Amino acid sequence: IASTGSPLAEESFKYVYENIKQDVHLASIAGGTDLVGCLVLGNLYSNVHKGEIQGQSLGIDVDVFTDGGKSTKDGDKGELVVKKPFPSMPVKFWGDSNGQKYLKAYFTRFKNIWHHGDFIERTSNNGFIMRGRSDSTLNPGGVRIGTSEIYQQVEDIDFITEGLVVGQDFKDDVRIILFVTTKNNQELDNEKVKSIKSRIRKNCSPKHVPSLIIKVPAIPRTKSGKIVEIAVRKIIHGEPINNKEAIANPEVLKFFENLPQLKL
C-alpha cells in the first residue's frame, strides 16, 4: 500500500496494520510530478517505522540541508535537496526561453543544488519524516515548525474534521493561526479550544500552540485534494492570490477575508 500527497500520520500507520492487514508493506512516498518519481520512498527489505518514510530512491543523491547549506544531523529538520543530477530531472520549462524560471524554481536556495521545497527530518533509522512544505513552515520566535507536526495532533481530536494552519506576521514576530472544521458543525467553545491547545502543548511543545483557533465552514483545497495553506496566508495578509483557478472550492476563500480576530 502506497500513500502520497501529504505526510502519512502515525495513527494512519497504526490503522492499516490493525484493521487492514498485518503483513502488508505500507509505504509513504514523496517526490513530484515534475520529476516523474520519488525522492524518498518505501523499501521492502527494511523495517517500517510509523510516521516515517523508509529511505531515499536509488540513484538519487538525496540529502537534508541546514539553511547554511550543510547536511543536518539525525533528528534535525531541514531542506530536502538533491546534490547531483538525476535521470528524471526536468531540463527546462515550456516557454522559458532563457531558463530563468527553471533556475528560480530549483536552484536559487543553494548553488548548483536541487532544492525541492520540502521541510523534512532525517531519522536515526535512515528514514525521513515530512514536516511540510518549506514555504508554509511556521516560524514563531525564530523556531521553524512544520505544519504537519500540528496536523498530526489535530486530526486525532474527535470533534474536529480537519484543520489548516498558517503563520500571521504579528508584532515583529509570527503567531500561529489554526483554522478548523468540526464534526456535525459543533460549536467551538472555550473548553474545546483549551483541549486542542493542551494536546498540542503536551505532544509537541509550547512553541507549537496556536495563538488563535478559529472555526471555519470549509477548508480550501486544490483540485488534487491538497489543502492550500499559502492562499490562506496571503489572504490574511491582504496579498493577491495568483492561481485561484487551481483551487477546487475557491468560494470558501471569502470567509478568510477581513476576519475580526486577525485584525492587527
Q: What function would you assign to each model-found segment?
A:
Residues 23-24, 57-60, 160, 210:
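Core-facing hydrophobic residues within beta-strands of well-ordered domains
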Residues 1-49, 61, 69:
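Gly/Ser/Thr-rich phosphate-binding loop
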